[in-house]
Amino acid sequence: MPLPAKAGAQALLESHVQDDYQRYHALMVATAMAGYAEHLGHDPHLWYVTGLLHDIDFEEHPDSHPTESLGWFKAWNYPEDLIHAVEAHAYSYNDFTTLPSTPLAAALLATDELCGIFYAYQKMNPIPFGEMKAKSIKKKIKDHSFAAKVDRATIFTGCEHLGIDLDEHVNNLIRFLGELPH
């Protein structure tokens, strides 16, 4: 199966993910990833689909995530860049130790958990993502009692491998996520 178009990827996501939050999280990550692809001169479609499908097996297989999806992606002949990115985004989760070795993988690792911070912040302050202030988001990153399940270390590891600092990354996500409805 070739890499699906956006509508096909969305249908695939919906066939495996029923939870509204997980679907919205996937959309947030996909949108941010497409923004990064354009910003860095890469393929926005590949990056969008990678972001959209990165947690496709989480709801069905939380204790082994992303093992199942990695198998599916290989069986479907998805690009190796996507497969590596999904594996690396699980760094330090379920005993995964693969670090990102591509810009796609680094961006996914940096973006995934940060989207959780953005989502939680928006629940507390219902403003559009594009109107959020980087200073406020960074303050919430430092507050480990806020969105306590978010693994902040992976955000920093992703930024390091992407070659950007946290300030730039937060500002990029404010810009990239600005198009999403709140």
Task: State each model region's role.
Residues 39-144:
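Divalent metal-dependent catalytic cores for phosphoryl transfer on phosphate-bearing substrates
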